Amino acid sequence: MSAKIENVKKELLSDNWYVLHKYTFDLKRKDGGSVQQMREVYDRGNGATILLYNRAKGTVVLTNQFRMPTYVNGNESGMLLEACAGLLDADSPEQCARREAVEETGFQVGEVKKVFEAYMSPGGVTEIIHFFIAEYHDDERHAAGGGIEDEDIEVVELPFTEAVAMIADGRMKDGKTIMLLQYLQIHRIMD
């Protein structure tokens, strides 16, 4: 069933870093009636994320960086352990995933596998994230990583079992990273 909307009005609220619009519209209900709704929609573009793993060592490579929204919402340090990720800009999802792996971790990986894509916060954000995994090897590290421009990213290599345990004990809070770790676990890629 597709939603039927009419009388859509769009108002620009902000275009400082990304774009925030207010939409007012009439939504046809399944009972035949309609209701007027208002939603603010944040458009930051689409992105890609990639989880690097090493079967032989039983490890994954993550990044640790400051994320202001987590700080505002109770994360005292603002630091977040996560799979590397970035916005597509003009790149394809795979190109973006590869670019972010090099920029953030220093690894220039070989084969990359797209595993799925998902809306991460569909109640207010347009962004679709493309999820990738890639096996890494120590000889594929061509740079230190750490990000670009004003990024200050720590590269963290962890045992896969510890990363999964961090989900259960609450230390792993990044949704995209949890999804990718569970993908490896469900598909027994690290066995």
UniProtKB/Swiss-Prot annotation:
Motif Nudix box, chain ranges: 86-106
Claim: Magnesium is one of the keywords in the record: yes
InterPro entries: NDP_pyrophosphatase (IPR004385), NUDIX_hydrolase-like_dom_sf (IPR015797), NUDIX_hydrolase_dom (IPR000086)
Any one GO MF annotation of this record: hydrolase activity, acting on acid anhydrides, in phosphorus-containing anhydrides
GO biological process, one term: ribose phosphate metabolic process
List of residues binding Mg(2+) 1: A85, E104
Enzyme class (EC, first level): hydrolase
Cofactor: Mg(2+)
Start and end residues of each Nudix hydrolase domain: 43-180
Known catalytic reactions: GDP-alpha-D-mannose + H2O = alpha-D-mannose 1-phosphate + GMP + 2 H(+)
The protein's Enzyme Commission number: 3.6.1.-
Coiled-coil annotated spans: none
A matching Pfam family: NUDIX
Subunit structure: Homodimer.
Database matches in NCBIfam families: nudix-type nucleoside diphosphatase, YffH/AdpP family, PRK15009.1
Entry similarity comment: Belongs to the Nudix hydrolase family. NudK subfamily.
Job description of the protein: Nucleoside diphosphate sugar hydrolase that hydrolyzes GDP-mannose as its preferred substrate, yielding GMP and mannose-1-phosphate.
Free-text note on domains in this protein's UniProt record: In the dimer, the N-terminal domains are swapped between the two monomers, such that residues of both chains contribute to the active site.
Name this polypeptide is given: GDP-mannose pyrophosphatase
Naturally occurring in which organism (per UniProt): Serratia proteamaculans (strain 568)
